[in-house]
Amino acid sequence: MHETAAAPAPAGFVPWPDDVAARYTAAGHWEGRSLGTHLAEAARKVPEAVCLVDGPVRMSYSELMARADGAAVRMRGLGIRPADRVVVQLPNCWEHVVVTMACLRLGALPIWALPQYRHRELSGVVTHARASALVVPDVYREFDHQALAHEVAEAQPTVRHVLVAGSDVRPDSVDLRALCEPLDADEAARVAAELDRSAPRGEEVAMLKLSGGTTGLPKLVARTHNDLSYMIKRAAQVCGFGRDTVYLAVLPLGHGFPNTGPGVLGTLLAGGRVVISGSPAPEAAFALMERERVTATSVVPAIVMRWLQYRDERPGADLGSLELMQVGASRLEPEVARQVGPKLGCRLQQVFGMAEGLLCLTRLDDPDDVVHYTQGRPISPDDEIRVVDPEGRTVGVGEPGALLTRGPYTPRGYYDSPSANARAFTPDGWYRTGDLVRRTPDGNLIVVGREKDLINRGGEKINAEEVEGFAVQVDGVLQAAAVGLPDSELGERICLFVVLADGTRVELADVRKVMENAETASFKLPERLITLPSLPTTPMGKIDKKALRAAAGRMSET
């Protein structure tokens, strides 16, 4: 029998207070078992059902667990131990799912990283996390990830192994596909029982998520088996996931949203099927929806707009199986939201979440005005919300303010980041999200901007998202982003970047007219409009205001 002692909490982990943890346990939110155990138990209920589709690969639950458990014991054979950090930088592929589950079964901590990361980002994550292993493709989109991983590993003494998926695995790398070969039936049963016995406890850290911040390198968020299992299960319940669910994973699996919101892991916990797409392009996604009879997916607003436009141009694809489309990561304009149901034939669900915990969803039975105009409400009855003014006083219903939260799946601090914790968390455990929201009488949140997303024009503080909200009311404007244009007289003037529908033309005067008709203060009117084919995004998929400010700054110099 191979049993391991409980893995020590990473040195930088901030636990919930004992009395709070006891309350969440008594409420039934925290079950005291590992996420890997929950996934294994779900798989045993439907062993022959197909659970994972990736191109020609069609994997049953029994095969998935035979591969994940096989990978777990082989990783252990490499010297990877519980609480070791494993950076997973893979594109959307079946190996991403298997190696994540292997880590969860072993007790190692996966850290999902985007394939777009290069030396600066990847080395930053590896160094901060003190990672033991890197998991990468050999080459992806003509970039040699294997070479980069070894370059990073050579500079970070904690990294002992580079695991590589692909056909060109170097002798000094570990062949990931060989590592993920399935155990035979007898061996699978023996290893499964062994891993069940040595599974991490619920209060132990399950994974480190990367924060979605746009300043500097992402921070690390330590999520426990208790809190993460509860969040995923509760989200799956709100979304109505079950054995008939067929989830299309079209967003990069380097993000948390398509994995845990409820996403891939929520689908597997519910006994459903995950279909992996390597591209969000409508041609590829619609073909998979039609072939696999997809019932649910999660996307970002930019993808929604591409899909709607494609649907207008080519209405032939059979999307009749699609029941639910989650949209999150950035604000979905109501004008776009209203088109989803009529054009794509499915229910829209707005999503507002963060790596730090809080997850808000509109509900399947919400009226259309709630779904179109709000970003939903927290999924747990024990999620706590405060909306406050700059002095920390609670504002009234409908008034904008800064969002603070705490709850059974919102950790009490970042991993090993005391200075960030001092800024982002109050002494009594409230997380300062940095979001500006309004709370409706029925408890839904409307995200109106970011606390730092303000333009200072001659001392007047202008919320950029307010300007953007007016801009997208102009016919032909698909996306808008307002930033401050440096100005020697006023400090900043308002510069508006827009993305237009094909064949349309929009002038600055068109936006100003909409704002003037709404009797908006004159100091909020944009003074420059720039059309782009697309808005730049951060590695976490959010609109990159820093890049736009830099572009605006260069323009002010010419």
UniProtKB/Swiss-Prot annotation:
Pfam families: AMP-binding, AMP-binding_C. GO terms for biological process: antibiotic biosynthetic process; fatty acid metabolic process. It catalyses: 2-hydroxy-7-methoxy-5-methyl-1-naphthoate + ATP + CoA = 2-hydroxy-7-methoxy-5-methyl-1-naphthoyl-CoA + AMP + diphosphate. Gene3D superfamilies: 3.30.300.30, 3.40.50.980, Luciferase, Domain 3. Signal peptide: none annotated. Pathway: Antibiotic biosynthesis. InterPro entries: AMP-bd_C (IPR025110), AMP-bd_C_sf (IPR045851), AMP-binding_CS (IPR020845), AMP-dep_synth/lig_dom (IPR000873). The keyword ATP-binding applies. The keyword Nucleotide-binding applies. Its EC number is 6.2.1.43. CDD domains: 23DHB-AMP_lg. Keywords: Antibiotic biosynthesis, ATP-binding, Ligase, Nucleotide-binding. GO terms for molecular function: acid-thiol ligase activity; ATP binding; medium-chain fatty acid-CoA ligase activity. ATP binds at residues 212-213, 329-331, 351, 435, 450, 542. Belongs to the ATP-dependent AMP-binding enzyme family. Catalyzes the activation of 2-hydroxy-7-methoxy-5-methyl-1-naphthoate in the biosynthesis of the naphthoate moiety of the neocarzinostatin chromophore. Also catalyzes the activation of other 1-naphthoic acid analogs such as 2-hydroxy-5-methyl-1-naphthoate or 2,7-dihydroxy-5-methyl-1-naphthoate in vitro. PANTHER family: ACYL-COA SYNTHETASE, MEDIUM-CHAIN ACYL-COA LIGASE ACSF2, MITOCHONDRIAL. This is 2-hydroxy-7-methoxy-5-methyl-1-naphthoate--CoA ligase.
